[in-house]
């Protein structure tokens, strides 16, 4: 029986993507469809004194002009996506979530103030220019380090300060460790704000059908089922009346996991009011001011060590920029806390985090979701410690890695899921040594770097391990069905934004049912096709949805073998699944196709036997109790031009401890994409 897991199989979805046959949100066109455009704030912080929409309403082709006041009682802030952790006592938390349209005050550049609905996007954009808004400019809170000054202006007037959250976590006895430390390294470390800037901007098409009383929404979301649930609640509908479809999406990276953007509420709402379909496609300028961002933190960090480089403790007091609102609560800073000790055995840890409101676009997870900041802090401190102690940077890391016999390793703090942070398994040293070997670390230090520096060239090398908590819950589900055609249909709630799900999920099913991987059809991200799930984020597609698909396919396999055993009059253990057939192992010609079995499983006559059910179909769910812990190493040789400060990457090596690899080709693409985004974050982005 041919096995597909582990094979470098070209992606099933690529022909559609390459030939333009894949459906994206902007491809959705419905007769009579209207178009939306938004007047957004050019001010970071200002009172709204007046809004004159008269000229916009009078423009030919304009159907509606909506302000916050025009929404009446239906205007309300969005619900928080994450609540404060119930297990932490030493915490202050203030939740302020985004609003559909600004009312009385704008809190960041790009905040929507007025929505215009027109017969075309051109008319809608022109009408936006007709609107007159009188602002009273206020001093903005632009810097997280001054946000908590007593004289600082308030982002939210109903609060006493710009404090969104304060929380302390600790492990061991940090002060005792500090008293015993032989070396103390202290630094202030800053991380800049950046944007994901996915290739495809956000977009929504909402279609309320008054006759069927049914809402259909096409949305560039990473979480179609939670979006459905939220829309049903906000619009006063049953969940069965709302269908959310996340078609092909040109990159997600976290911002498209946001629930809910103002536009995601406003377009379905206005579609219901007008009884017509409405489309909005974000332009690139809007993307930079109206789509969530991440990364900005300032850490006052400290590392305690012995003279031989053994880490005794790590502490950091840090500020996290939440922007104007905090819909995701503590997700980002808790991820930072959880990763600020890296892959190392750190017996004493103290973390004091403060989240502040600023007059900037609010922050939500972007690829890494707070984890890269924590890793950067501990690795920066280790590099400084290695230099001051005269220890090789790789050697000081090897001395402090969590040893293999320490797993499962309890960090002694909670993570973003509000559960005990436990690293499930690992053996880190071989990956570090492999990366050093691949990049030629010893040869570079011994021969290449001295030679190049003698020529006046500025070259350096670094090797950094990382851990990442991934594959988090709560759960995902899947349904696997054998069709009478012999093809397999798989439905799951997770959407896809380029991860290769149409192929990797098909490989899982093909291995179980003995079919060609191209005979497995995936339907994903459609709440009408599969009703329960969470979304695609935190590297959880393969781990969580993949396990649900595997469980469903396993049940279907059992049904197939049971029915085939009856029809072929052969014990199940003597049957094989291959090439879409069930065969008797020693008599290949004695067989039956999966399609024929599917037809037999759905009889047109006779009663269904007790304890059985028609069809070759199964639905299963998978919910991990805790996330999986990924580990890897990045190594780079770089040259810097001292006159222009331009950089050139000479060599770059990545070693990943991946566990079971579903498809090496897809895996390579994921790693390459992560490296490219990381290089962009480090060298080319600052907002």
Set out the residue ranges of the language-model regions.
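Flexible, low-hydrophobicity surface segments
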Residues: 1-161, 184-187, 273, 600
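Glycine- and acidic-rich phosphate- and metal-coordinating loops
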Residues: 241-249, 280-282, 522-523
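Short, well-ordered beta-strand elements within core beta-sheets of diverse protein domains
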Residues: 35-48, 112-118, 367, 378, ...
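Short, well-structured alpha-helical segments that form the helix of a local strand-helix-strand
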Residues: 392-400
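Thiamine diphosphate
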Residues: 248, 252-275, 279-281, 501-509
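Helix-loop-helix junctions that connect adjacent transmembrane helices in secondary transporters/permeases
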Residues: 84, 149-235, 403-487, 507
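Gly/Pro-rich active-site capping loops and adjacent beta-alpha segments
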Residues: 2, 73, 96, 107, ...
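Glycine-centered tight turns that cap/initiate beta-strands
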Residues: 61-64, 241, 308, 519
């Amino acid at each position: 029986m041919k096995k597909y897991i582990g094979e470098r199989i070209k992606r099933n979805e690529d022909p559609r993507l390459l030939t333009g046959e894949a459906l994206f949100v902007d491809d959705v066109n419905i007769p009579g469809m209207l178009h939306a455009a938004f007047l957004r704030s050019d001010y970071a912080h200002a009172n709204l004194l007046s809004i004159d929409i008269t000229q916009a309403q009078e423009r030919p082709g304009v159907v509606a002009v909506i302000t916050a006041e025009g929404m009446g009682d239906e205007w309300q802030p969005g619900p928080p996506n994450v609540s404060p952790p119930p297990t932490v006592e030493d915490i202050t938390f203030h939740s302020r979530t985004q609003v559909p349209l600004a009312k009385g005050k704008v809190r960041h550049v790009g905040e929507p103030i007025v929505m215009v609905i027109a017969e075309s996007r051109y008319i809608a954009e022109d009408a936006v220019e007709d609107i007159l808004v009188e602002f009273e400019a206020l001093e903005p809170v632009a810097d997280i380090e001054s946000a908590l000054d007593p004289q600082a202006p308030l982002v939210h007037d109903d609060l006493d300060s710009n404090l969104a959250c304060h929380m302390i976590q600790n492990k061991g006895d940090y002060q005792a460790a500090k008293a015993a430390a032989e070396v103390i390294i202290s630094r202030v470390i800053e991380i800049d704000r950046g944007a994901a800037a996915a290739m495809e901007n956000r977009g929504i098409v909402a279609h309320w059908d008054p006759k069927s009383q049914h809402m259909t929404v096409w949305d560039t979301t990473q979480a179609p089922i939670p979006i459905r649930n939220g829309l049903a609640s906000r619009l006063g509908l049953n969940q069965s009346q709302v269908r959310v479809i996340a078609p092909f999406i040109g990159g997600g990276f976290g911002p498209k996991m946001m629930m809910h953007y103002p536009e995601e509420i406003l377009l379905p709402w206005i579609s219901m009011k007008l009884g017509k379909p409405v489309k909005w496609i974000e332009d690139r300028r809007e993307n930079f001011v109206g789509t969530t961002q991440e990364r900005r933190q300032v850490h006052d960090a400290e590392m305690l060590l012995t003279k031989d480089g053994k880490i005794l403790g790590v502490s950091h007091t840090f500020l996290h920029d939440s922007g104007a609102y905090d819909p995701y609560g503590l997700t980002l800073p808790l991820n930072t806390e959880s990763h600020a000790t890296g892959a190392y055995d750190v017996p004493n840890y103290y973390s004091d985090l403060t989240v502040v409101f600023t007059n900037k676009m609010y922050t939500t997870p972007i690829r890494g979701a707070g984890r890269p900041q924590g890793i950067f802090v501990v690795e920066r401190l280790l590099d400084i410690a290695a230099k001051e102690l005269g220890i090789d940077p790789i050697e000081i890391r090897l001395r402090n890695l969590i040893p293999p016999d320490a797993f499962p390793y309890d960090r002694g703090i909670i993570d973003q899921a509000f559960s005990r942070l436990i690293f499930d398994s690992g053996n880190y040293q071989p990956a570090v040594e492999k990366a050093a070997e691949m990049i030629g670390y010893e040869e570079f230090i011994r021969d290449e770097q001295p030679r190049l520096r003698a020529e006046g060239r500025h070259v350096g090398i670094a090797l950094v391990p990382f851990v990442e908590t991934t594959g988090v819950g709560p759960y995902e589900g899947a349904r696997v069905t054998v069709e009478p055609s012999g093809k397999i249909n798989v439905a799951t709630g997770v959407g896809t934004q380029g991860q290769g799900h149409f192929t990797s999920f098909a490989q899982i099913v093909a291995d179980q049912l003995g079919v060609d991987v191209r005979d497995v059809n995936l339907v994903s991200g459609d709440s009408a096709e599969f009703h329960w799930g969470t979304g695609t984020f935190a590297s959880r597609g393969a781990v969580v949805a993949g396990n649900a698909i595997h469980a469903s396919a396993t049940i279907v396999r059992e049904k197939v073998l049971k029915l085939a055993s009856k029809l072929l009059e052969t014990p199940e253990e003597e049957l094989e699944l291959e090439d879409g057939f069930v065969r008797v192992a020693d008599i290949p010609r004695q067989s039956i196709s999966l399609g024929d079995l599917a037809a037999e499983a759905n009889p047109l006559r006779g009663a269904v036997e007790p304890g059985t059910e028609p069809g070759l179909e199964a639905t299963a769910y998978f919910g991990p109790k805790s996330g999986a812990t990924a580990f890897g190493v990045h190594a780079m040789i770089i040259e810097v031009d001292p006159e222009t400060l331009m950089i050139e990457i000479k060599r770059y090596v990545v070693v990943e401890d991946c566990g079971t690899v579903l498809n090496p080709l897809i895996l390579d693409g994921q790693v390459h994409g992560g490296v490219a985004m990381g290089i962009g974050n480090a060298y080319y982005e600052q907002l």
